[in-house]
């Protein structure tokens, strides 16, 4: 998943479907370059002395990029990303002595799997791709972001309908009403944040972060519904404090996410007008959280990122894909 998340997961062995599967198969995961246990690790962290105040947003992004390159190494970054991951999977297949690859891929992993099938069609026995990423969006980071925002809004709509049906939270099943209600709650938290037991503020930013995280998994919807209900009532339980304190992503995985996305996709240089148009389009694609009071029209991370792979140049787009591919939950 990710990109930026490890593929080695020792806890998978405790899932009952895996127990049955292991009667016939060995399950092998790997951490892509720069991720998890792979070394060197992608590192974009800055010391307190390196984090400057009173600078432009563009300079802040450039400082972060410089930290990524300095800490990780430019030569290392040139060999990180989806392009290298595809070749690494085939090297793993060869090292195992398997004539063909049998694999399961999730989310971002489906991008690697699809590229593998495209590049090595005769090396595929069978691959299941769950939560499919459209690899044709690799050439256009904006299209990828736009589709993701649209998917988030569609999920929010389903969540609101579920909330109304189960009476789990005060959102309406009507799309426009639900968005308005959510905006009213965001506005309320923005002007009068709640205070948790540690004295920390719970503002609109915390609700947006919690929402984008918990929407992803239907099993997390009850927690999100409880948070919305409690915030509407001006209270915060221990359960919701725990959910808020859980890290959405580690610093390492966040660093790797940004670097790999930008290495793979990058962005063309935009005029201020084009940049504003794109940010408006993204906001309109996910209107439920279109409440960014500090929205900037400065260049984003990928637009300023200087190192790119040759992934799109080397794609074999007219190849016949192997028959042993199963696509799930596109």
Feature-to-residue mapping (PLM):
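Long, low-complexity segments enriched in small/aliphatic residues
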Residues: 237-265, 269-270, 275-276
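Flexible "cap/lid" loop of the alpha/beta hydrolase fold
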Residues: 133-151, 227, 236-250
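Structural motif
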Residues: 194-209, 216-220, 247-255
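Short helix-capping/linker segments at secondary-structure and domain boundaries
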Residues: 215-229, 233, 267-273
